[in-house]
Amino acid sequence: MIRTFADNASEDLFNGVDSRRARSACPRELWPIVRRKLTQLNRVRDLRELAIPPGNRLERLSGSRKGQHSIRVNQQCRVCFRWEEGHADEVEITDYH
């Protein structure tokens, strides 16, 4: 379950709000995919559930994002988050590369 968002843009996308912040977070054509990924993240109770479907490409991040995980939206866009006590915290949509 999602507990917190890292920014308002990601929260707007999750809630289906068409805001300037949401438009700056990722291209509009990706919004349906982003919402589907965020809904999936909100439903899981165990991090391993995000490994299915394989297209999510669940990853543990390193470097400046150590402690975070990500699932893939497309080649560049990711949903990044911290997984703690069965919940997703600091959820954000980002161009990871």
What annotation goes with each model-predicted range?
Residues 62, 69-97:
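Enriched for short, Lys/Arg-rich terminal
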Residues 1-37:
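Arg/Lys-rich, positively charged N-terminal/basic patches that mediate binding to nucleic acids
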Residues 26-54:
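Short, solvent-exposed, low-complexity loop/linker segments
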Residues 45-69:
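A short, surface-exposed loop/turn module that caps and links secondary-structure elements
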Residues 1, 9, 46, 54-57, ...:
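Glycine-rich, flexible loop/turn motifs
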